[in-house]
Amino acid sequence: NSILKNGKEVKLDMADKIQNAYESSKNIYDDVLTQGNIFSKLYIKLFWNGTNDNDIAQKVLSYIPNDFSGNLLDVPVGTAVFTEHKWIALKDAHIACLDYSMDMLEQAKKRFDGYTHIKCIQGDVSNLKMNDESCDIVVSMNGFHAFPDKKKAFQETWRVLKPGETFIGCLYIRGKSKRTDWLVNHILSKKGWFTPPFQTEEELRNILKEMYKQIDLHIDGSMVYFCCTK
């Protein structure tokens, strides 16, 4: 993949491709995730078998106590469309919201403007600028199916998490719906919104079992949500 820059064709690496994809889709991103209009609802019903991202987001966030007061990493924060109210309410916590896309991050910053316990940081999940075992909770909603280096992302989110604490998230898994898999492989991946390879349920369970001692994992269509204890 390449773009024209100053009259010259410049090759894009995968990370840049992803950032450009999200910048070009900024006006529809929240609508699709939250089913904000009739076209989004039809898209979810047709290609995702009605799986409701709003419901999954609430299930993910329900793993986090309302009185949580530790260090929390949210990666990728995206536009914070699902997490805004929960993070704002956790006033005694220290929350780092990280995203590779500056465009997504700018939208998240607007939502968290004035809240000193929340910081928005541009960064790469495969190379987190954080100390080992520095987080009490790591949250990753709709991130791992987009990360270019999934192995490093799993390693880094594990590295920064304290022993006995929780890794919480949701992501797309392949093998549950031919229609969804076709959409992901032929449309979403080519747009740069998703990045192969993708795990099956069994492959994801095996990855998590190698890294975490307790796993609470649930399937909803082609999406999985989980809470793991290190």
Which residues make up each language-model segment?
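C-terminal alpha-helical "lid/dimerization" subdomain adjacent to the S-adenosyl-L-methionine
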Residues: 168-225
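Class I SAM-dependent methyltransferase SAM/SAH-binding core
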Residues: 73-127
